[in-house]
A protein has these predicted regions:
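Short active-site oxyanion
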Residues: 22-26, 115-120, 211, 250-253, ...
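Active-site and donor-binding regions of nucleotide-sugar-utilizing enzymes
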Residues: 1-153
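A short, gly/pro- and small-residue-rich
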Residues: 77-98, 183-193, 270-281
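Conserved catalytic-core segment of nucleotide-activated headgroup transferases in glycan assembly
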Residues: 4-10, 148-227, 301, 336, ...
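Donor nucleotide-activated moiety binding/catalytic core segment of transferases
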Residues: 47-56, 217-263
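C-terminal alpha-helix
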Residues: 310-317, 343, 347-351
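Short glycine-rich, flexible loops that bind phosphorylated cofactors or substrates
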Residues: 72-74, 173, 262-263
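Catalytic binding pocket for nucleotide-activated donors in carbohydrate/polymer assembly enzymes
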Residues: 226-230, 260-332
Length: 353
């Protein structure tokens, strides 16, 4: 995806390295993708996914740098082939999709996992300790560099009109349910209740604030079930319509549940509210590496009333981050200097491949 860590690292390389340094750096993307326009200007350094050139370059690459498993380099991942075997032998620097903390991934991305990699980029001391103690890496293979995409983050919220970004994650246990089953699920009922809450509407009205609901693709088909009853202070934005990082930069506060986007918003010193009404089910299904009941930053709620108390407090106090969260940030974010991509490149340059 040409919005994520892989894209921003590639962009840094194209715009900051000399011709010799960037000569052999390439970005793979399907030319039919909506994101292709973001990288088209880099010409010969952009390779069409599953093209002949792509296959040839897979065979000869020194290292894969990606925000997902290197298995995604190839469309037919389940079928044995010469290309698949070649990918398996290549080293990978994992840039990550989001901070590893709120969801256990060691069975997939751990050193002994099904999609292990040689190098695992981390963002601070807390995450590096997770990578070492839970995933099996070490200080050399889990360097603290920060995320490439964080280099472009800046606070763009407007004083004229504040908005709260609501971005819940999907639930794996709802993956195969029917429409009727979904509509009686706690997940649907809780978010439907929140979005139609008269109290929420009053808070938004009294503080001249909007709520922007960024819709997960798997939730999109159900929006019309309650959309008509919702206040005009609630806006729905389908996934992909506006770049997510743009929404995070413009928002005044985030409401999520278990999504790793919370770290991006926290990185910008903005308040984060966690609505975890189904925490026990989530913890049983996925687990986490930190105790979310006791050690989570931000404000955590398991009921709508508690969540709205927090919404009201922050809306009435200018959406200023809690002091305890501001003081805790350095243990999560080693760097906030817009040089994360440079550190990643320096790490690559200083290691033999």
């Amino acid at each position: 995806m040409a919005q994520d860590n892989g894209y921003y690292f590639f962009k840094y390389c194209m715009e900051n390295l000399d011709e010799k340094e960037k000569k052999n750096i390439y970005y793979v993307i399907d030319k039919r993708s909506d994101e292709y326009k973001n990288v088209e200007k880099y010409g010969k350094h952009v390779i069409d996914f599953m093209s002949v050139k792509h296959m040839l370059y897979i065979m000869s690459m020194s290292i894969c740098i990606s925000s997902d498993s290197k298995s995604h380099l190839y469309a037919w991942r389940t079928k044995p082939s010469l290309v698949k075997r070649a990918i398996g032998k290549k080293k990978e620097l994992f840039l990550q999709h989001g901070v590893t903390a709120l969801k256990q991934v060691h069975q997939l991305f751990g050193k002994k996992g099904t999609s292990s990699m040689e190098y695992f980029v981390t963002t601070g001391r807390v995450e590096q300790e997770i990578a070492i103690n839970e995933l099996g890496y070490n200080e050399k293979t889990a360097p603290i560099t920060g995320f490439a995409r964080w280099d472009v983050l800046e606070d763009k919220q407007s004083d004229k009109e504040k908005f709260i970004l609501l971005m819940p994650t999907w639930r794996s246990w709802l993956e195969e349910v029917s429409d009727n089953q979904f509509l009686v699920s706690d997940y649907y009922k809780k978010y439907s209740s929140l979005l139609q809450s008269p109290r929420l509407n009053q808070i938004l009205k009294d503080t001249n604030t909007r709520l922007v609901f960024y819709i997960h693709p798997k939730f999109a088909g159900y929006i019309d079930n309650f959309k008509a009853a919702v206040s005009n202070r609630v806006t729905y934005i389908p996934f992909g319509k506006i770049p997510l990082n743009e929404l995070m930069m413009r928002c005044s506060m985030l409401i999520t549940d278990y999504s790793s986007v919370c770290w991006d918003v926290y990185y910008m010193d903005k308040p984060v509210l966690f609505y975890q009404f189904d925490y026990d089910m989530y913890n049983q299904a996925h687990g986490s590496y930190i105790n979310m009941e006791n050690d989570l930053f931000g404000n955590r709620s398991t009921t709508e009333d508690s969540l709205l108390n927090d919404v009201e407090y922050f809306a009435n106090n200018g959406f200023v981050e809690n002091e305890k969260d501001r003081l805790a940030a350095p243990k999560y974010f080693e760097y906030r200097d817009n040089n994360n991509s440079k550190r990643i490149y320096d790490f690559l340059k200083n290691n033999e491949f």
